[in-house]
Amino acid sequence: GMVESGVDPDLIALEPLQSPILTTGKSGAHKVEGIGAGFEPPFLDKSKLNGVRAIDQEDAFNMCRLLAKEEGVFGGGSTGLNVCAAIEIAKEIGPGKRVVTLNCDNGLKYLGSHIYS
């Protein structure tokens, strides 16, 4: 991994703006599967985080559609959150730095859902 390679990455946790339990302590209804469960996960070690960001689910879903159309990358809502945050961070830190994010799953199971329909 990155740490074993001598890289000291900043780790940013993400959550849907509609359920910002980590950033505000308040949960809410949202449509991003597999994230923002409305409670702080017991395995989350906040001491290892450099920040937490709440991303609007609609921005994430729009990003999913854009990634599929422009890049041929299928992902679910959490992937959309990741890419939205990565773009925000890249703009903030400027040129000459690297931002790494993940595509959490493929979008096939979301084809008939609110994301791609």
Name each model feature, range by range.
Residues 2, 64, 82-90:
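Buried hydrophobic packing segments
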Residues 3-77, 114-117:
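Active-site/ligand-binding loops adjacent to catalytic centers
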Residues 37-38, 84-117:
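Phosphate-binding loop/pocket of nucleotide- and phosphate-handling active sites
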Residues 50, 62, 82, 103-106:
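Detector for Asparagine
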Residues 73-81, 100-102:
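A short, small-residue-rich loop immediately preceding and capping a beta-strand
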